[in-house]
Amino acid sequence: DTGPWYRFVRKKDRPFSIGRLSAFAGNAGVLLRAYVYARLLGREGMPRVAEYATLNANYLAAQLRKRGFTLAYPERRASHEFIVTVAPQKKANGITALDFSKSLLDHGIHAPTNYFPLLVPECLLIEPTETESKDTLDRFVVVMKMLLDKSASNPDWMKGAPYTTPVRRLDDVKAAKELDLAYVPPSRAA
């Protein structure tokens, strides 16, 4: 039963509904998934996953630092995310944060947020989830180290990545200037 607190629902029409979900509160599907996730974790589970997220971020930060990456804020302990700057690689070989992100895609790794925050040059905002296993984190470290080495030995290869995705690098300038917001099948294109 919906109870008396949902004034916008007619009980006679839908006795078990909480009413219409609309966009005023954001994406209703995302909100519902977040709510279900929090409820499934429960009172004890929420602090535990926060601890795992922090542990994963600090582990990755330490491992990447050991392998030659520059942390934007090395004196800080990571909360659930940390920032790596590849500005030294850009200065040495012209390799950018975008090149690292695109190269990760070839290894089946979702690219981290790049160029945020804007005050850190050539940065990657790395945010491992609380559910990543140590094996997955270690694989990420191995791939990042390989890319760091490749940025020095074969920078042109990294500038061309990704090679294995259905779509390679998009023309960002063209996309910003020509706002095609609808798909037109090739047979109907002018």
Question: Where do the protein language model's features map onto the residues?
Answer:
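Active-site PLP attachment segment
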Residues: 1-3
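Non-catalytic terminal extensions of PLP-dependent enzymes
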Residues: 9-10, 14-20, 25, 38-190
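His/Asp/Glu-enriched, well-ordered alpha-helical/loop segment
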Residues: 34
